[in-house]
Amino acid sequence: MGQGPNCGHCHQALFEQHPLTLDAASFDKHIGRSHIPVLVDFWAPWCGPCRMMAPAFEQAAGLLEPQVRVAKLNTEDEQAIAARFHIRSIPTLALFVNGQEVARQAGAFRTAADIAEWTRSHL
């Protein structure tokens, strides 16, 4: 972790090589104000394909950061945000650039490399 960029105020690492957990309070802050692309996994704890993809998504953070911020949003806990973005099936990956959704993919990816390749293809 010592190799990545650090916060100018608290000096903690900005990227931790694992997905950031988003909630209602942090979603707009990270999506709307980010100067780098943000890849969000919309998921739920009861979803089998979501659980199957979780390790690959975790590994994808290490492949994509710091060029892309990787985050997760639990649609059960944050139903209003899921409704706002018309999430109809999970898992759904959405890529945001400058606060705007630029790509979306419903369904589970098998590998971190597949997630990284899909993400990079939309930048």
Predicted regions: what is each one?
Residues M1, L14, A54, Q105:
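Cys/His-rich microdomains that often coordinate metals
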Residues C7-C10, C50:
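Short cysteine-rich clusters marking metal-coordination/redox-active sites
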Residues S34-V38, F85-A94:
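Structural micro-motif
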Residues C10-P19:
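Short Cys/His-rich micro-motifs in 6-15 aa windows
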Residues N6, H35, F42-W46, S89:
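Short pre-active-site segment immediately N-terminal to redox-active cysteine/selenocysteine motifs
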Residues P19-V38:
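A short beta-strand-turn-helix
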Residues S89-L123:
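Non-catalytic, surface beta->alpha helical segment in thiol-disulfide oxidoreductase systems
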Residues T21-L22, F42, M53-I81, I87:
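Thiol-based oxidoreductase modules, predominantly thioredoxin-like and allied folds used
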